């Protein structure tokens, strides 16, 4: 049986140029959370989301130089470990900058989107799903450990749904989640811009130029947006 580790990072922003300032994980009954100096200033826009300030990290060690680094690297890179995060590609990008490269991962965002076959869910961010699915947990939103506790409950809900839908046992459901997480997922509706709330397949027929423009914007973006790029190419038949 694979060892499941739920984790979350808080960072200086959401682009390729940003760095880790907090990491939290849950491994069985063990929970861990700590702050680190990211080596660059945390902008107020980021602090407003996760409430980690420059003053809180100014005397902290860099993550790669900390006493925690070796243990976390060994734990996350163990071939028997599956790391789980919401929008895991971003968290993987952040920890790969610290030379931590997990072998196996599950993205609860991609799994949630895959299970929503009819595209009925408006958005898939962690806190939205928490309240939509009425997940009961005593956790602070946008705090790394708080997000991890919500993540664990969401993972269990999604795993049980896959088990029920496909008549699988626990291990088979986990393998299915790994498989779903390994490739881009397709958005079915759009929740921003002039076509907010519309099906993407309808927009492709009515306003193909908008999707062409959006694809170009996503390709130029600084943050990884693999799912949107894959989705837009799908609807544009590229």
Regions found by a protein language model. Give the residues of each.
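A short, structured active-site edge motif that brings together acidic residues
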Residues: 104-115
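General alpha-helical segment detector with a strong preference for membrane-spanning helices
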Residues: 12, 55, 90-91, 111, ...
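Acidic, Mg2+-coordinating catalytic module of metal-dependent nucleases/exonucleases
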Residues: 82-89, 93-94, 98, 124-189
């Amino acid at each position: 049986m694979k060892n499941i580790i739920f984790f979350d990072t808080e960072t200086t922003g959401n682009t390729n140029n940003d760095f880790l300032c907090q990491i939290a994980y849950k491994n069985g009954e063990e929970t861990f959370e700590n702050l680190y100096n990211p080596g660059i200033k945390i902008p107020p826009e980021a602090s407003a989301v996760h409430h980690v300030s420059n003053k809180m990290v100014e005397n902290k060690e860099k993550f790669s130089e900390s006493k925690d680094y070796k243990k976390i690297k060994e734990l996350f890179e163990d071939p028997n470990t599956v790391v789980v995060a919401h929008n895991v590609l971003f968290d993987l990008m952040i920890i790969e900058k610290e030379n931590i490269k997990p072998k196996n991962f599950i993205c609860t965002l991609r799994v949630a989107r895959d299970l929503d076959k009819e595209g009925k869910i408006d958005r898939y961010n962690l806190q939205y799903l928490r309240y939509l699915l009425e997940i009961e947990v005593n956790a602070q939103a946008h705090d790394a450990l708080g997000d991890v506790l919500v993540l664990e409950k969401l993972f269990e809900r999604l795993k049980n749904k896959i088990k029920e839908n496909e008549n699988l046992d626990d291990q088979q459901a986990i393998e299915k989640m790994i498989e779903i997480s390994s490739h881009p997922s397709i958005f079915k509706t759009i929740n921003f811009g002039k076509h907010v709330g519309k099906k993407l397949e309808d927009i492709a027929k009515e306003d193909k130029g908008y999707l062409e423009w959006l694809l170009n914007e996503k390709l130029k973006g600084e943050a990884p947006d693999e799912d949107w790029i894959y989705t837009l190419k799908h609807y544009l038949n590229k």
